[in-house]
Amino acid sequence: MSTMNPDYDYLFKLLLIGDSGVGKSCLLLRFADDTYTESYISTIGVDFKIRTIELDGKTIKLQIWDTAGQERFRTITSSYYRGAHGIIVVYDVTDQESFNNVKQWLQEIDRYASENVNKLLVGNKSDLTTKKVVDFTTAKEYADQLGIPFLETSAKNATNVEQAFMTMAAEIKNRMGPITAASDSKPSVKINSSTPVSANKGGCC
């Protein structure tokens, strides 16, 4: 139980990035509000929603940011990435170009986000099976090469949407375990003066 803030144990900032039209806003609406609309209008600016979840007995507040159309103008700046704990890169399984552009989005992350930020690759619109052009295996192999989790989702019928955000939250929580975001309660791993770090242990950044 946190003494600093009774409402949550962790606060994670998540970003949704990817080409315009891949369904980022729809994923956000589905996860945060459990709603879906075909006619979601892209707004200019940055929008975010908050949802609190329970994970491993901890209360985690997710602050999820959506680019809200900025990617069309390539105006996403470093300030958008600053402080992000996790970034979800979204492509459209019916749009090969959006998948091809994942590499560019990952380069943006490398350029602007913190070095150890968690990443998740999401192929959205999996309900459009007859229009699908990006094979699951192809995307999975790519994600495996990068060492990041991968899921196919459908904001329309809610397939894997919950799982995508929960996967991301779990990945961040595992990484941040020792340094609880909103609580100074028990660090699970602590290196102190009685635990010398030898050179042959290898890096663990």
Swiss-Prot record:
Residues 183-205 are annotated as: Disordered. Keywords: Endoplasmic reticulum, ER-Golgi transport, Golgi apparatus, GTP-binding, Lipoprotein, Nucleotide-binding, Prenylation, Protein transport, Transport. It comes from the Eukaryota. SMART domains: ARF, RAB, RAN, RAS, RHO. GTP binds at residues 18-26, 36-43, 66-70, 124-127, 154-156. GO terms for molecular function: GTP binding; GTPase activity. InterPro entries: P-loop_NTPase, Rab, Small_GTP-bd, Small_GTPase. A lipid is attached at C204, C205 (S-geranylgeranyl cysteine). One of its GO terms (cellular component) is Golgi apparatus. SUPFAM superfamilies: P-loop containing nucleoside triphosphate hydrolases. Pfam families: Ras. A motif (Effector region) lies at residues 40-48. It is found in: Golgi apparatus; Endoplasmic reticulum. Residues 183-198 have a biased composition (Polar residues). GO terms for biological process: protein transport; vesicle-mediated transport. Probably required for transit of protein from the ER through Golgi compartment. Belongs to the small GTPase superfamily. Rab family. This is Ras-related protein Rab-1A. It comes from Lymnaea stagnalis.
